[in-house]
Design a protein with these regions (language model features):
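Protein kinase catalytic-loop region centered on the HRD/HxD motif
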Residues: 214-222
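Catalytic activation segment of kinase domains across protein kinase-like and atypical kinase folds
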Residues: 223-250
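Conserved structural core of kinase catalytic domains
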Residues: 124-206
Length: 250
């Protein structure tokens, strides 16, 4: 799946509108200070939270757009156009927690995703990832298109739970007729889920995939991490895919 010229034109128009309304250019962390009984607390607050309310009325009314963000990138979604979402990278001016490259330049986490998707294609496991491509650049900001995938945390968590329960069954002395024992069993499952590493989460979701070992190796080699339930989604053709796979260099 690759974006068409019409898809790229749509994304370009949206980005032009964002800049025209000073939306993206203001997407920067501002240092704030709060006072409490013990003294002062310095923290950073992303203005995106404010703009989501201040600006979203215009963009939702005129374009049907919804805005989401993580630590490293922003995502712009039109739920009436469920083919692609627009992703824009954050840098240290957006989030001071983002690390720089060794040469001092900011890390483009969206570019990392596009590069890793290309390598996944070369490995023949691209169906496990939401397709990601660079779409253009405006005012020095590159933007990207990623295959639309609907996040369903409950479904992904169910996969984690099923996998974890099978593992816990191997060592837990379970008594299904003992209510207290069953409660302890369920607690042990959730503890197991909380301790699962990213490769285990991949196995939980892609357990029937013929290339599961190759996928796990790819996840490890590419430093793909933080695969919690909100970083998965379901594409229009029903595939469950990873939607945030740049890896976080915090």
């Amino acid at each position: 799946m690759k974006p068409t010229i019409a898809d790229i034109e749509w994304a370009t128009n949206i980005m032009n509108e964002l800049f025209a309304h000073n939306f993206y250019t203001a997407l920067r962390y501002e240092e704030r200070t709060s006072t409490y009984s013990g003294g002062e607390n310095h923290y950073y607050e992303l203005g995106f939270d404010e703009w989501e309310y201040a600006e979203s009325g215009y963009f939702r009314e005129n374009y049907g757009l919804h805005f989401y963000r993580g630590e490293t990138k922003g995502c712009i979604v039109d739920f009436n156009r469920q083919e692609w979402v627009i992703k824009v990278p954050f840098d240290r001016s957006t989030n001071p927690k983002c690390r720089r490259n060794e040469d001092g330049t900011s890390i483009d986490y969206c570019a990392l995703e596009a590069e890793k998707y290309a390598r996944a294609c070369a490995e023949g496991i691209e169906e496990c990832f939401a397709a990601t491509y660079e779409a253009g650049e405006i005012n020095g900001v590159k933007f990207y298109l990623q295959e639309f995938a609907n996040v369903d945390e409950d479904s992904t968590t169910d996969s984690f739970y099923e996998y974890a329960s099978e593992q816990v069954e191997n060592y837990f002395n379970r008594d299904e007729e003992d209510e207290g024992n069953e409660e302890l069993f369920r607690e042990e499952i959730w503890d197991f889920i909380n301790d699962m590493d990213d490769q285990e989460r991949v196995i939980a979701v892609f357990n029937d995939h013929k290339n599961i070992r190759k996928i796990c190796d790819f996840i490890y080699d590419e430093d793909i991490n933080d695969l919690h339930s909100a970083n998965w989604g379901f594409t229009n053709d029903g595939r469950e895919v990873i939607i945030d796979y740049s890896g976080y260099k915090g």
